[in-house]
Each structure stands twice: as C-alpha cells, then as structure tokens.
C-alpha cells in the first residue's frame, strides 16, 4: 500500500525529529478522532521507548512559600492568601535524607524546588552541596529555582546537576493572563542559559487554567520548536488552590488532557513526557490512557511541592495492574541509541514499501523497538 505522505496524521509519524511545527498541523492532530490520535502517539512511543517502562522521579520543596512572583495558579506566591506555612531553605542533611527515602521507594531522579524568583548568592553554596550529596546516592538530580543567569547555570552544571526545570506554563498569548512578574522571554532566556551550560532541560506547562485549546496548541508548538526538544516535558493539570485567582476555573475534560499528552508525544518523540501535578485528581483509567498516549514519566510520592500526589503504594499497585515498571536509569538509551532506533525503523518501513511514513492502514506488522536489559541498546522485534 502506498505511503500517505500528504496528511497531517501521516506526517506526525515521520521518524525525523522536527522543530518547525505549524499551528495548523498541531490543530489537525488535536482534531483527530481520539482512537486515531492515541494509535499514532503509541506507535511513536514504541519506536523510541520501551512502552512499559516509566521513569520515576520524586520532588521535594526545599524552600516553601513567600515567592515574589504572582503566578495565579501557585500556592507559594506571596501575593495570595493560601494559608501555606512558609519555610526557610531546608538543611542539606534533611534533603539527603529525603532523597535516600525516595531512592528506596523506587525513584531514580530526585527533584528539588525552591520558591524563588532567582537563587540568591548566599544560598548557592547550600544548593550546590545538595546536588553533590544527592548525586553521591547514585540518583539523577533536577532542580527548579526560578530564573538563572549564565553564571548560576554554569555553577549548577559544574556541581553535577543533570536536569533543570523551568516551565513555559502556557502559550505566549495566554501567558499575561496568568503571570505578570516574569515575561515569556525571561523564561526562554533561562532555558537557553541552562542548555548552554550543558544541562538537560525539563520544560512543560499547565493545562486547565481557563485557556482555550488554541493555547494548548501554542504551548506545545513553543516546546516542540525550541532549538533542542526538552529531554523531559511535564504536563501538569491545574491543581486548584483556595485563595489563588484560579481556584474556581472550570475543570478541563480528562479526554482533552489525554489528547494534550498524545500530541506532546507526537511532536517530541524522543522526550520523556511526564504526568506531573494533578495526578491526584485522575482516576486509574485516565492515567492508563495517558500511559497509552505516550506518557512515560511520573512524580512519585505523597507530595508534589505543596499539593497532594498519589501515594507511592497506590502507584506501585497501578504499575502492577498495568504491567509497567520503573525505568532503571542505567538502561536509558543514549542519544546515539535513539538515533540507531530511528534509522532501524526507517529502513524497515522502506523495505515494506511504506516510504518514510508509518502506514496506519496496515496494523498487521508493526516495528517495536525496546531496550535490551543488559546493554541498554535498542533492539527491533516484530509483533
């Protein structure tokens, strides 16, 4: 059967990673029938990842409350009365203790967040020590500390920080309805400083803040058209906090959330797409659909900064029911391994007279690339 190369659907499953997505193309993906969208997202997910492996992170608030920013969704903003108890920067020993417990519960990455506009010079030595000591536990490290200049990014990288989280939150058009104390360009500048320092980028957004679908399209377009896709893309569902301006916005349709996850997977096929804030509000069935749509990372544990998160034991039971398992970071594919998997998929499809595009009409033979448990390299099988 000839390849279908002219439609947005078939272009989405081209194995080449793109940075030139048009809004009309992303609109077309969102508009697909739900089953078709999930099928395409799942096909791309399987081409790049073990579909039953989920990267597990734990997030700890190392400095809580009194943030000078006015993000309308955030309980930590000093602009709103959310009755959140303020806390100073945690002691390094306490952070290491929490990281050790997270590792014992199956987390491979430990993320540390501070409610700052930007790190202060006097706090940096403690932050850098946290990174070093958590790394000594054999865990990956991630931080979110607000805006970074070049010097701060360089210091974090030198200490060994693996990932830096700095979300775009929403589309450029809707951004001013949510935040006024920090510009969109401020966020993009921090991301550039992080990337230039050699760290990996964790960057996503929040949905369900009263935005339109066009804003979700715009957010994903911004992420997918960055010079390098974020290695990790957290998709947050708004957690409504009493006292914040967004406490009473209408709920987002769960299927629209799943669609957002699926489109993120298609646009950024090599990135980890993380179910982040808001999982507490999702039932197991909605989470299962997200995993099917290409989500392959979660935050694990009872707290996500200052909001509830599903308990670790519940996550373990859900993983068992779905037949999925935490990803061992030692078996994560390198960039070269991802490229090898891409080339293998392309070659196989060419041999099947399907051009460079996945043929959604022929479901009898699908290439499945998984990671060999011993080598961490991709292998190709058929099913």
UniProtKB/Swiss-Prot annotation:
Known role: Catalyzes the conversion of dethiobiotin (DTB) to biotin by the insertion of a sulfur atom into dethiobiotin via a radical-based mechanism.
E.C. number: 2.8.1.6
Disulfide bridge map: none
Protein name according to UniProt: Biotin synthase
Pfam families for this protein: BATS, Radical_SAM
Superkingdom, natural source: Bacteria
Homology family: Belongs to the radical SAM superfamily. Biotin synthase family.
Cofactor notes: Binds 1 [4Fe-4S] cluster. The cluster is coordinated with 3 cysteines and an exchangeable S-adenosyl-L-methionine. Binds 1 [2Fe-2S] cluster. The cluster is coordinated with 3 cysteines and 1 arginine.
Stored CDD domains: Radical_SAM (cd01335)
Necessary cofactors: [4Fe-4S] cluster; [2Fe-2S] cluster
Binding annotation for [4Fe-4S] cluster: 67, 71, 74
Subunit structure: Homodimer.
Residues reported to bind [2Fe-2S] cluster: 111, 142, 202, 274
Domain called Radical SAM core: residue spans: 52-276
NCBIfam families reported for this sequence: bioB
Catalytic activity: (4R,5S)-dethiobiotin + (sulfur carrier)-SH + 2 reduced [2Fe-2S]-[ferredoxin] + 2 S-adenosyl-L-methionine = (sulfur carrier)-H + biotin + 2 5'-deoxyadenosine + 2 L-methionine + 2 oxidized [2Fe-2S]-[ferredoxin]
Pathway given in the UniProt record: Cofactor biosynthesis; biotin biosynthesis; biotin from 7,8-diaminononanoate: step 2/2
GO biological process: biotin biosynthetic process
UniProt keyword annotations, A-Z: 2Fe-2S, 4Fe-4S, Biotin biosynthesis, Iron, Iron-sulfur, Metal-binding, S-adenosyl-L-methionine, Transferase
A GO molecular-function annotation: 2 iron, 2 sulfur cluster binding
